[in-house]
Regions:
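Short N-terminal binding/cap micro-motifs at the start of the first secondary-structure element
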Residues: 11-15, 39-40
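Extreme N-terminal starter segment of soluble prokaryotic enzymes
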Residues: 1-2
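Glycine-rich beta-strand-centered segment in the early N-terminal region that forms part
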Residues: 22-35, 49-100, 105, 117
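P-loop/Walker A NTP-binding region and its immediately flanking N-terminal helices
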Residues: 108
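Cytochrome P450 core scaffold surrounding the K-helix E-X-X-R motif
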Residues: 40-46
Length: 118
């Protein structure tokens, strides 16, 4: 598959990379159709970092995406192959106090897809 990768400060390349595979029963394999460029992508391009999040090159950019579901793991029930989805790059823990109160966006352990080191 093709991926746009940061290869150094202010350097990008379109590369061919191995296509991911379903590994867990909860995995969903997506074909990315469109990707937005957000502020964090610009920071990674210009400076190679945001605070303690430092890019290790080469690095695939983009985390705000629209995609088509290609395949799903055995236990996935909410989407199926062929569905169109929008990606929320925020990944909540669902176990902390904030998550239990329904405030997943303020999760104490919030992580973001497409972020170095996460």
């Amino acid at each position: 598959m093709k991926a746009v990768m940061l290869t150094g400060l202010r350097q990008m390349e379109l590369r061919i990379v191995p296509e991911p595979k379903i590994k867990k029963d909860t995995d969903v394999l997506l074909k990315i159709e469109r990707v937005g460029v957000c502020g964090s992508d610009v920071h990674y391009y210009e400076t190679g970092r945001i605070g303690s999040q430092i890019v290790e090159y080469p690095y695939i950019t983009g985390h705000e995406c629209a995609a088509t579901v290609k395949a799903v793991g055995k236990s996935v029930t909410r989407v199926k192959a062929g569905d169109t989805v929008a990606i929320d790059p925020a990944v909540s823990c669902y176990t902390c106090t904030q998550c239990k109160l329904g405030r997943e966006n303020t999760c104490y352990k919030l992580r973001f897809l497409g972020t170095p080191g996460q």
